[in-house]
């Protein structure tokens, strides 16, 4: 199992190379050269999330690590979860299940991918006698999950860029209250896209690194994050019907990594009936899946801030594998020229959308109404992102009438103002969220300027 770039420049890379590089040298994203096949019969014999992970993760890591090494690593990877089996499942009615992915230490689905990344980062760095810098950007949950996953590894320093805007107090304080010498939280006077641009430029520059250091990617472009997310799709299918029936998945998304993990599950073995791409009014993905137009627009602040993104960084993987059938030259041309040139596919190619995907986009008013209805009718509290995912259900006028699994990507306790708007008086608290509100904050303020950020890293890289 080796990996290649979506733009054709990097080929035959090992898992460890892809883990440590994140972004390919040609600007593309890594993807397996061939999709491995999971053993459905062995999956049906699994009893836990860890059992699933022990079958799935080694399919992607064999070029760098023995299976026994990986299994040992996985036994200690996911920690501080509320639930012993990591994922919760809520049956709303006969047609709708909610996959609760928020029981980890930072109350968001990103704990799954980032704890796996951190464990493999540490393994690779120890093996190669290296240290590392993590430079990441966050619109909500990535930063806290990355900081929490990596803070105990002293060979890793984390610098996290926080944009101005719509992050909740709890989301921000999950990062700014971490007081450790290897963690730096930078408040950036700019948008999330400005922060993403600085991170991307860092992987081309790297002048702030010491000679024995590597720069690591924790944003959703890192393939290892995708692997961690693939595992919970298999787990949900095992728990709901033990792989006996096709399911539809509704995925609230911004950067498209969670959607691509669902698509990857399909490529490994599992028949997925439909993937619903659910977004808020930042609707670049909905415009593509409904109108064949992928065009960057200005970002709008919403009640679901983790989806307030105008460019979906993982979308390139789907274009390359699903639509273009691995035509790297065309993919490179599309994304080398984007966002200056919007992307539209030929009609014959784009029509493949109907085979697997549907999409939806809703605003804050509809989001709040869904939160209200779910609480009133089912006595269940969802956060705004999960509400966006629920809009594809037939009970809210959406296209999917049965066998629907909606991913709940964040705990509702992160979004207290949204709960007030939805007139939801009480909810089950998460074990870590209330702790951060009264802690002292530690952070630094910088302009959205790559030189300022790089110089800050240099001054603190000792």
Tell me the role of every PLM-derived stretch.
Residues 1-462:
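PLP-dependent amino-acid enzyme catalytic core
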